[in-house]
Amino acid sequence: MRDSIENISQLQKKLNDLQLENQILKNILDKAGLSYHKELSKLRQSGSKEAFDPEQGKRIIHPQAITENMANQFFSMFWGRQDVYAKRSVNKETGKAAYYPQCNNFWTNVCHKKIKDGINCKDCKNRSYKTITKKDILNHLQGNAYNASDVIGVYPLLSNGTCRFMVFDFDNHDKDAEEKDFANSDDTWVEEVESMREICVLNGIEPLVERSRSGRGAHVWIFFDKPIDASFVRKFGFALLDKGAEQINLKSFKYYDRMLPAQDSLPEDSAVGNLIALPLQGKALQDGNSAFIDGNWNAYPNQWETLFNKPRLSQEFLEEKIKEWSNTIDDIAANAAESDREKPWNRMQHFNKNDVEGKLHIILANGIYVDNCLLYTSPSPRD
């Protein structure tokens, strides 16, 4: 028994040493501007010989019928507010798609959209939101509407300030992106989504990655086993991104649009928070979009099995991770500060311009700033 305990102790010490060595080597690579993330992903996927399948829709095994029980199970994973929900709508003239909260008074004589007096839904005194029903969920999953007007979106932030899931959104929400179902304009977003997936895996989280209905965007879903305070969930999400910034060398994260829930609590102006379109949209699924995908970006054949087998995180897990990451970040900062004090002349803070993209404008506070290039070429003003 004593020998077993000693062996376990030795193995634990060896594991700690390897983890420390691993972190040191990662820091060296980061300082040198070398990315280990892509190589790590290649090694992890080397065991899989399956290449990307161009026939994504045909990969999916569609159930013969979507039952009410399946709809209930589906909503238990994507549990948003039940007293209000949104549906997709396409403008016949512009072709732009948008999601609107469903109201019992929509387009009646008291509806401000019909009156066109500029009053928003959240400020409308005649507002009467519809509650989500099993029929709405079934229509979403079946996808019988030719223009996908049966697609629904939910509001993750519940009225009591909790949420049952979080999602990282990699869709394009720039101006006029609605015309192409919020599709991204190039393929850089794919690398960023893979980075987000890798960040989760490196930290013991099994996310569910969904390719958006456009086929050129994604959502990274994380589920909880019970409602958790939204402010704490957002704290966890930001801590996860901070930790990921230490682990993965990525030039930019420009296609990461937002994290939902997007607020710590509901605002007092009767707003319902931000919405997210739900996956497994029947019509888009026929093309392999709005589908859950693996590391090779292939749609899982059995979408339902993949969804229901995805583990849900507990609040205790979130608490442990935040504590763990806080200690790690504090230790690294303390060690860096100590090194600066001991041998400041031997330490250089390296900056590699290839590690970042874009421009940074720095303006001195309480100073005079004139953003006018002609100022330097025009004749000097006279007294």
Regions found by a protein language model. Give the residues of each.
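Signature for HUH/AEP ssDNA processing cores
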Residues: 2, 57-216, 223-239
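Secondary-structure boundary/capping micro-motif
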Residues: 4, 19, 28, 44-46, ...
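DNA replication initiation modules
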Residues: 151-190, 194, 225-368
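Conserved small/polar residues in nucleotide/adenosyl-binding loops
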Residues: 376-383
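Intrinsically disordered, low-complexity linkers and terminal tails enriched in Pro/Gly
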Residues: 37-66, 326-350
